[in-house]
Structure formats: structure tokens, C-alpha cells
Amino acid sequence: KKVLVNDIEACYINLKGAETLNLDNWDGSISLVKYVYANTVLDKEDKDCVVFLEFVNFVNRMVWLSSTERLRSLGTDLPGGNLLETICNLKDGAEELEAFLREAGLAFNLVIRDKGEGKTIYCKMGKREVPFAPLMSSGTRSLVFLFLWYMRRTSVSFVFIDEFDAFYHTDLSIAVINKLLAEEHIQVVFTSHNTDIISNELLRPDCYFILEDNIIQPFCDLTDKALREAHNLQKMYKAGAFHE
């Protein structure tokens, strides 16, 4: 059953509570879904309306992250501005970040200090405390981005991480993937150019996709072979087994 249609031939809504909505006022500057959601009081007892509202709720909790650009989001408001200041305002922020980085194999002793210019994070190095920001490599900064999302993960439905391991070595990439796999109630999609993470031990063949010429296809649809756990997916990929 179609409850909302917007194409060349027709544009209509079939939801209880939207019968009197005037589509002449919709100028296309926002999606039709968002327009309906913002301008109607739908019947929450109607199953079609329930599905529509659940869909909107899911989309509003989608997040897009990029390791090579600034932190951005779709629907969900994630903290912006100075990363370390934001973490300082989290409960046990420095301790949580330290533990998160240790899981990734990075050992820092982090503390929050305010030395006259606002709160920020310092790193203990022997008897000295030095600002953490100048110590962060590109990879560490990328992990801090990821940490900010991770602390908000209970409010997120779907996360897309573009070039998630652009600044990671392979072991760190695998550690991050395993961290994400442990989250059962979030769908995660990430992109990478690192073929060293193509492994049956990490993900099933139907979880690996090739994106090329605006077409995305899973490995399992790109070969006639029955892919088994013993297969070396990376070796097959490099040999061209998944290129039509």
C-alpha cells in the first residue's frame, strides 16, 4: 500500500490526519516526508501512520561522519565546535576518552584543566601536563570524532562513516570495526580503500560491497562461486574475482 507518492505523474498522501493538508503550499525546498510530518497531526492508532512516524524517527537519528572532513550529521544534532571542549562537558569525559583510546592501542593519561582560557584536555607526561590538542595525530583526531558519536550512540539509529580509516593502520581499522560490530541496535556502513580489512574472519562476504560508477554491489553477487569461510576474500578481490 502506498501512503505517500511523489513522482512525475502523481503527488498524494494517504495517511489518516493528512486529509486536509494543502500540497499547493509545498514548494519542494524540503522533502515531502518532512513537510507532511511538520504540518499534520497523524492518527497514532493507525498502522500506516505508525510506520510512517517510525520511519521519520529512524531518519532523524541517522548520522554521517567523515574522517577526512569535519563532523557532520543528518537529523541528529551532534556536538560541534571545539572537540576537546565538548568532551570536557561530558560526564567523565576525559576518563571515557582515555579508555576509548586505550582500546584502540593508544595510551594517554588525560585530565581536564582550566588554566585561564577555558576547560580543555591535558596529557600527563611524567611530571608535566601538556595540552592534548597539539599531540593528536590525524588518526587520533579521527578517533576523537568517532568517540563523540560513540558517547551519543543510544540516540543514533544509523551511522555512515566515510573513509573511516583514512588515517588508521590496519590493526586499528580492525579494532574500530569490531567496536562497531558490538553495537547491536545500530546499523553501520563505512567506506574504505584499505583492502587489508577484507576478510571472512571480520565480516561475511555479503557485508562487503564495491562502489564503482555510482553502482553498489555485494561481493556475493559479483561471483558465481559459493563463497565459504575458508576463502581468502582479499586474495580473490585482488585477483579480480569480484570485478565483472
Language-model-detected regions and their locations in the chain:
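Electropositive, glycine-dotted interaction segments
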Residues: 1-109
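Short polybasic amphipathic segments
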Residues: 1-3, 10-13, 117-126, 207-210
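A short, sequence-level motif marking secondary-structure junctions
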Residues: 18, 133-139, 220-226
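Conserved ABC ATPase signature
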Residues: 115-151, 155-158, 163-168
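Short, solvent-exposed loop/turn motifs
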Residues: 9, 20, 128-131, 215-216
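Short alpha-helix of the ABC ATPase nucleotide-binding domain corresponding to the H-loop/switch region
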Residues: 169-174
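Short glycine/proline-enriched coil/turn segments at helix->beta-strand junctions
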Residues: 106, 153-156, 183-187
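C-terminal lobe/lid and adjacent interdomain/linker elements of RecA-like ASCE P-loop ATPase modules
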Residues: 114, 175-244
